A protein has these predicted regions:
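Low-complexity, highly charged intrinsically disordered N-terminal segments
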Residues: 1-47
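ATP phosphate-binding P-loop of adenylate-forming
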Residues: 71-76
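Poly-acidic low-complexity segments
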Residues: 1, 6-9, 151, 230-231, ...
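Positively charged, low-complexity/disordered segments
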Residues: 263-265, 269-271
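Domain-scale recognition of functional cores that engage charged ligands
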Residues: 40-69, 80-264
Length: 271
């Protein structure tokens, strides 16, 4: 426990807890800032857009030049799916029986194949952020499946950090006597994880990006089974607009939400 406590930065932890509790309290009293649509000038729609092919070409050229990488947020376990394995190992009941990791690996392979039409052999490095509970089983799963046909040298595993579990009163919780309870620090832990060595004594992800000449990263969550990994149209828009970050969304066209329930046979609309 002493070793755990020595690794905790009290000032940083206090800031995190304070901000979390303030945000929670504001949400309870509806004091949080209203969410407004982004400015029109910051939006680009590629649905039926004659410029979509133009953006795709930009994205493909960057991919062919080795400037595009893919970053997967895969620290979660499939507990809500009834599985203790990493989410990416989960069989989503497709006829093929392919896991989420398998589907995404195939899409990277296809992207490399398509981009190779614009130049020599193309490599799209795949950076996979795991967590303490998921790193070992994730790496084992990839080895057992031959990295789904990808070159292991271009699949880089790294690990997000952890934070002590804190009560609503701001007190550090114990997992058991003499052991601090900890949990992965969420997707926000990505930025620190990018700077940390992928393994002890090895370079960081940022070092690897620099070595490979990767300028653009497409980041996504592991449970997005429909993701267009390294989508050249999306990457092309971001490159052409010279933006530091971009978000790809499905535009909401109706104020109601459709959902299904085991308790009802009909689709229901909720405002």
């Amino acid at each position: 426990m002493e070793r755990q406590l020595r690794g905790i930065d009290p000032a940083k932890l206090n800031d995190i807890v304070k901000n979390a509790l303030i945000a929670d309290e504001a949400a309870r009293h509806e004091q949080a800032a209203r969410v407004e649509p982004p400015p029109v000038e910051s939006q680009v729609s590629t649905v039926g857009d004659v410029n979509a092919e133009y953006y795709r070409e930009i994205g493909m050229k960057a991919t062919a030049a080795g400037q595009v990488g893919v970053l997967l947020l895969a620290g979660g376990q499939g507990t809500r799916l009834g599985s203790s394995a990493p989410k990416g190992c989960y069989d989503i009941q497709l006829p093929s029986g392919k896991s989420l990791f398998h589907l995404q690996a195939e899409r990277i392979a296809k992207l490399q194949e398509l981009a190779s039409q614009h130049g020599a052999q193309v490599i799209v490095p795949w950076y996979i952020m795991t967590s303490g509970p998921t790193r070992e089983p994730t790496e084992t799963f990839f080895r057992e499946h031959g990295f789904f046909g990808l070159d292991p040298a271009n699949v880089i595993f790294f690990e997000q950090g952890t934070l002590p579990c804190i009560s609503n009163e701001g007190k550090i919780m114990l997992d058991e006597p003499g052991k601090v309870a900890t949990a992965p620090d969420g997707n926000g832990g990505l930025y620190a994880a990018l700077r940390a060595p992928v393994r002890e004594g090895q370079p960081s992800v940022l070092d690897d990006l620099h070595r490979r000449g990767v300028k653009y990263l497409h980041a996504y969550g592991v449970d997005n089974c429909l993701v267009k990994v390294g989508d050249p149209v999306f990457m092309g828009v971001c490159i052409e607009k010279q933006v530091a970050t971009g978000v790809k969304v499905v535009k909401k066209t109706d104020p109601c939400l459709l959902y299904t329930s085991d308790a009802a046979d009909d689709m229901q609309c909720v405002d």
